[in-house]
């Protein structure tokens, strides 16, 4: 009871003393410590910026909730899905608490052993991948959470690729060791085979499933138990006798894996010397920071086991802001390597301020902009510049975020994550002070949307609310795209999946009081050519007075399959036949004409327009002439080309009980899926397949019915590839019917 009274008081005013078990080793602690953590006197060594990311339902939010509790940031723990009527702190949106999923990245900060930790909890659904991209772009390190039962899953691979793209060092935490069928050894094996990671256990479990009692620390060679009602008392003991041999073997394996990627430990290993605990810890840190080794930790967040050692590992093995190299680009036309400028992580005002807006949110007091500070100092009341728009803005209010609660601060320094109010900007914008307004941070990678639906308000009187909501959502989320189809007179919204668009339709109703009607999902088909086609096109227009004249000669080429979503323009002209000032006009004409293909009306992609020669007229040639010439050249080339329709292919992962294996395989085959792999544990099997997105609609209902509700699946975009002849014929006929070039079949309504 005494302990409960202490923890219940956390977060409300000064505390006389906080016990060592909560992360402070018997030091005086005050809640206001959190308010001091932005000050310049806090060195970089005392700061960590980390993200927690994983596949859906691996336990990221539950883990974050435990971290906040053990570090004294929250007084009581709550469960995901609001089982206790409250819901997790980090799931602040009502929809998140209802569904038990994380939709937006929530930012918080806490303290562990005198080190300030900024944490971003990210979604696991592939539909919300942009949130993970944004988080990893601005973090220095991450914790990748795996489920001990599911192991490496679809989204785990996506997150791993994203971490590689942004060069983020990370630890792995295998969660849910208390679940039936948990197998951490299998999860480790999958990390090595599927993700190609040089990974090894730093801990091994004492028991599994219902017998999971604690963990063995292989570095310090001791057993760790978690006592007390909430696992808050960490107790160290000797390794149980029956596990000593296994612990020795795993420790040797750990040393070998680290020695393979760290030179200093490798030398000790070759000399057959036994490394000391500090030697091993330093080697693991060096190898983790260089991304050549992944340490693997174990536990069960729900059962309050293994969280405190993971926090210690974050401090020991993940980098502080001064150990990460962040670059800004000079805003020049040729942004090559030489134009990259290294940011200085010093926590003072000796260098100009540079920050990146990585997330936007509509808060209670206007737009909230999350900013990662890379260099210099940002003060409340100071003036900063948006390098994209060139506009200057005043920082009226500077806050630190704890999920949806905020705390005002006077200044932040390099390495801090903060939020600004009332600043008009877009995600990925760079802010600087006047001294260096030609700098910008590298922009965040934004994947293309793969699915579209028509959306309109149920009530025509709600059009104003609808447009307000759409404007806000597109500003906050770059993967949520909107355009107006002039032919069907419909507003088309595009996103990363059915769930993504469904969530926005629900948010429109909840947050703007505007119920929406959504149409049938439409897949983002594309058209491309199968072989190079030459063109030689002249645009001439004489109507008295100044006319128009532009001639272009070149070739239209298909791109490689991995570039099917791109459009490229190549200027290979010599001399002044096509004046250089008109080349961008030719490119504009080409890109404009790619908006609609001749075969099925879908966009053209996977093309390279190579401009080789042409001609101009001294008087009649102008920009519009060459725009029309570019458009005409593309149409001329397409008229003699062999076109094909390409479609998005999804990587699908299905998990279901073994008795339904036949039905699941048959279902995937019916949807023209190509099975790429399979594995199984206990009574469940996992099927991996590549399936056209067009064939995946309604699959969740089919899977539920054929597995008695026990099967589940996830999918993510993989690539574009040519669709089947039958699908192509169907799409072409549908387009011809819609445009009146083909009579509509009897009994079939126009689409």
Curated annotation (Swiss-Prot):
Cited PANTHER family: ELONGATION FACTOR G, MITOCHONDRIAL
EC numbers: 3.6.5.-
GO biological process, alphabetically ordered: mitochondrial translational elongation
Main localisation: mitochondrion
Binding-site residues for GTP, renumbered to this chain: 54-61, 121-125, 175-178
CDD domains, alphabetized: EF-G, EFG_III, EFG_mtEFG1_IV, mtEFG1_C, mtEFG1_II_like
Name of the gene this protein is made from: Gfm1
Protein name, per record: Elongation factor G, mitochondrial
Record PTM N6-acetyllysine, positions in chain: 176
Transit peptide: 1-37
Residues recorded as bearing Phosphoserine in the entry: 92
Pathway the protein contributes to: Protein biosynthesis; polypeptide chain elongation
Tissue localization of expression: Detected in all tissues with the highest level in liver, thymus and brain.
Entry similarity comment: Belongs to the TRAFAC class translation factor GTPase superfamily. Classic translation factor GTPase family. EF-G/EF-2 subfamily.
Domain tr-type G intervals: 45-322
Pfam families in the cross-refs: EFG_C, EFG_III, EFG_IV, GTP_EFTU, GTP_EFTU_D2
């Amino acid at each position: 009871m005494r302990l409960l009274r202490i923890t219940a008081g956390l977060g409300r005013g000064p505390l006389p003393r906080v016990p060592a078990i909560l992360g402070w080793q018997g030091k005086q602690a005050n809640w206001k410590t959190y308010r001091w953590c932005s000050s310049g006197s806090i060195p970089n060594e005392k700061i960590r910026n980390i993200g927690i990311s994983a596949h859906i339902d691996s336990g990221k939010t539950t883990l974050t909730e435990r971290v906040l509790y053990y570090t004294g940031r929250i007084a009581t723990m709550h469960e995901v899905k609001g089982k206790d009527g409250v819901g997790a702190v980090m799931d602040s949106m009502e929809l998140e608490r209802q569904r038990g999923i994380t939709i937006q990245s929530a930012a918080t900060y806490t303290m562990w052993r005198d080190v300030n930790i900024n944490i971003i909890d990210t979604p696991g659904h592939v539909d919300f991948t942009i949130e993970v991209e944004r988080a990893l772009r601005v973090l220095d390190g991450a914790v990748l959470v795996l489920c001990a039962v599911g192991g490496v899953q679809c989204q785990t691979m996506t997150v791993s690729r994203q971490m590689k793209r942004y060069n983020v060092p990370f630890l792995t935490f295998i969660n849910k060791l208390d679940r039936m069928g948990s197998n951490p050894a299998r999860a480790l094996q999958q990390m090595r085979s599927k993700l190609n990671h040089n990974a090894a256990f730093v801990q091994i479990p004492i028991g599994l499933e219902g017998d999971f009692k604690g963990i063995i620390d292989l570095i310090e060679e001791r057993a760790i138990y978690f006592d007390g009602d909430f696992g808050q008392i960490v107790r160290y003991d000797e390794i149980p006798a029956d596990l000593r041999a296994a612990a020795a073997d795993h420790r040797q394996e750990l040393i070998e894996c680290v020695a393979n990627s760290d030179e200093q430990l490798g030398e000790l290993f070759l000399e057959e010397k036994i490394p000391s605990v500090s030697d091993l810890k330093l080697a693991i840190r060096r190898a983790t920071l260089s991304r050549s080794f992944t340490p693997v930790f174990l536990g069960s967040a729900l059962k309050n086991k293994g969280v405190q050692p993971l926090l210690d590992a974050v401090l020991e093995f993940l980098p502080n802001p001064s150990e990460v190299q962040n670059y800004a680009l000079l805003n020049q036309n040729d942004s090559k390597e030489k134009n990259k400028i290294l940011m200085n992580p010093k926590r003072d005002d000796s260098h100009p301020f540079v920050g990146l807006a990585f997330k936007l949110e509509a808060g209670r007091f206007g737009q909230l902009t999350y900013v990662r500070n890379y260099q210099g100092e940002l003060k409340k009341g100071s003036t900063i510049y948006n390098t994209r728009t060139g506009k200057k803005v005043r920082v009226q209010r500077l806050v630190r975020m704890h999920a949806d609660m905020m705390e005002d601060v006077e200044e932040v320094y390099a390495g801090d994550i903060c939020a600004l109010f009332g600043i008009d900007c877009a995600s990925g914008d760079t802010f600087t002070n006047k001294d260096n307004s030609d700098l910008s941070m590298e922009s965040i990678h934004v994947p293309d949307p793969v699915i579209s639906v028509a959306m309109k308000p149920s009530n025509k009187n709600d059009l104003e609310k609808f447009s307000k909501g759409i404007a806000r959502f597109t500003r906050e989320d770059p993967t949520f795209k909107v355009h107006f189809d002039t032919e069907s007179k419909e507003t088309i919204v595009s996103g990363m999946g059915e769930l993504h668009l469904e969530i926005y339709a629900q948010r429109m109703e909840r947050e703007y009081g505007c119920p929406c009607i959504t149409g049938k999902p439409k897949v983002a088909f594309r058209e491309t050519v199968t072989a190079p086609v030459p063109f030689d096109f002249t645009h001439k227009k004489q109507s008295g007075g100044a006319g128009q004249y532009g001639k272009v000669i070149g070739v239209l080429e298909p791109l490689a399959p991995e570039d099917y979503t791109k459009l490229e323009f190549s200027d290979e002209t010599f001399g002044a036949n096509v004046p250089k000032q008109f080349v961008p006009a030719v490119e504009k004409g080409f890109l404009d004409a790619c908006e609609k293909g001749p075969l099925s009306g879908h966009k053209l992609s996977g093309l390279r327009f190579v401009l080789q020669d042409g001609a101009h007229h001294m008087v009649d040639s102008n920009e519009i002439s060459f725009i029309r010439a570019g458009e005409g050249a593309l149409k001329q080339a397409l008229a003699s080309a062999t076109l094909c329709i390409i479609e998005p292919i999804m990587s699908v992962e299905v998990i279901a009980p073994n008795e339904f294996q036949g039905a699941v395989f048959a279902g995937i085959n019916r949807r023209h899926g190509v099975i790429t792999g399979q594995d199984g544990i206990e009574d469940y099997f996992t099927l991996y397949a590549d399936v056209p997105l067009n064939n995946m609609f309604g699959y969740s209902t089919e899977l539920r019915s054929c597995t008695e509700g026990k099967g589940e699946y996830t999918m993510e975009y993989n690539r574009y590839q040519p669709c089947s002849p039958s699908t192509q014929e169907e799409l072409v006929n549908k387009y011809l019917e819609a445009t009146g070039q083909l009579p509509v079949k009897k009994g079939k309504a126009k689409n």
